Amino acid sequence: MHIKISTDFAIQNLHCTTMIRPLLRLCGQRTAATPFVSFFRPPKKPLSGISFARHYSPTKKPPSEVPTPTPGNYLVPITGPPGDTPRDTDLLIKSLTHKSLLPENNLVRCTVFDSDGNVTVASGEFKRTELLNKHGLLPRDLRKLDTGVNSIVPTILVRDNSILINLLHIRALIKADKVLLFDVFGSTDSKTQSLFMYDLGHKLKKSNKTMGSLPYEMRALEAIFISVIAALDAEMKVHTTVINGILSELEQDIDREKLRHLLIQSKKLSAFLQKATLIRDVIDELLDTDEDLAGLYLTEKKAGHPRAIDDHSEVEMLLETYYKHCDEIVQTVGNLVSNIRNTEEIVNIILDANRNALMHLDLKFQIGALGLAGGTFIASLYGMNLKNFIEESYWGFLGVTGVASLLTVWIIAHFLKSLRQVQRVTMTSDKKKAMKKKDTVAEKRRNHLRNWLTK
């Protein structure tokens, strides 16, 4: 449990602690183990809220459990788990410190495209509050585009005068005459991001005749979907090529290293399938909402002529086109996942068959050893220094040897026959087969008797 105290009160305690520490050193006391709360007497004026609970708490903790406050850290641990070390406590305090206290987290880096497709600001830094007030957004809307948050869930949000998009490597804010492309960490120098920015600037130009009469926001949307589908298609081809090569190699030889490689690629393919499925679902969800489809026409809304709720045929056709592309990618990857699962099942069957073959061979050796043990048992009986009354017999040796050999052969043949019967795997048991055979014989007899009586 942690209690958050006010900033002014914590800084005041810190200054007083700093002033008293030299006096404590002269007295030979340890300042690290002395709680800073004990340096102050209860205030003369009444306290309220958390400060009152802090000064007049009925449970007092030992000095070793109260840490020395540091600037920027105002979370004081009151209790901790058993066996908690000071290092773990410090890490917990640092992780619980809100990142909004840091000044650099109040800035957002983004590139701005104007109505002609030209870059007016390249990787500029803007304050969050400035973006929220200027574009009429809420803090929760900006969090969807926060470059510091590694979110795998894609989003397409339609607001009154803007469209928020978070798809793969693209996080953008589209307006009727402007596009803000937020910088994503680790993708500023990537080839995909560079190609997308070039294609976006080209499609936003008014002189571009290939886009037809689409409004500004539709051209930006199409450029974003083209980049997203191209990235998904390229990644799908890589996964397909690698996994098909592994599956073809497994058909020739089943190796542990190949199976391990298949496991790694299967995990990557599952993650890619989830990513593509989420993108397809977010487009499908947008297609099912007529209000959002009509709200995508930002240019007409800015001119004071918003579209009716059921008047969105152009943007619906645009979204359906890329929905089909994304669904095709999902189906292709799903078939590849099914091939991997089928291959895994076949490999397991082959390994089980090999294991059964080894067990069968081991049983044969054991049966042979059992037969030899039966023959040597007779030999051991005649090896004792006792009279057996056939010492002087001419046929004694041959008779004993023959009996031992016949016993050995009989044991081996009997158990091998039993092993072959166990190996037969049928859908019906032997009892059902015998009953079916008896029923067939009885039916034949009844038919024969019926024919004889009719004559």
From Swiss-Prot:
Family annotation (Gene3D superfamilies): 2.40.128.330, Magnesium transport protein CorA, transmembrane region
Biological process (GO), any one: mitochondrial magnesium ion transmembrane transport
Key words, A-Z: Ion transport, Magnesium, Membrane, Mitochondrion, Mitochondrion inner membrane, Transit peptide, Transmembrane, Transmembrane helix, Transport
Record-stated family: Belongs to the CorA metal ion transporter (MIT) (TC 1.A.35) family.
Official protein name in the record: Mitochondrial inner membrane magnesium transporter LPE10
Coiled coil regions, renumbered to chain: none
Pfam families (alphabetical): MRS2-like
InterPro entries: MRS2-like
Transmembrane segments: 365-385, 396-416
Membrane topology: Multi-pass membrane protein
CDD domains found in the cross-reference section: Mrs2_Mfm1p-like
Function: Mitochondrial inner membrane magnesium transporter required for mitochondrial magnesium homeostasis. Modulates the conductance of the MRS2 channel. Involved in the splicing of mRNA group II introns in mitochondria by affecting mitochondrial magnesium concentrations, which are critical for group II intron splicing.
Subunit text: Forms homooligomers. Interacts with MRS2.
Predominant location category: mitochondrion
Cellular-component GO terms for this entry: mitochondrial inner membrane
Compartment(s) of residence: Mitochondrion inner membrane
Organelle targeting peptide span: 1-56
Single annotated GO MF: magnesium ion transmembrane transporter activity
Ranges spanned by the short sequence motif YGMN, renumbered to the chain: 382-385
Listed Basic and acidic residues bias regions: 433-444
Gene behind this protein: LPE10
Region Disordered: start-end pairs: 433-455
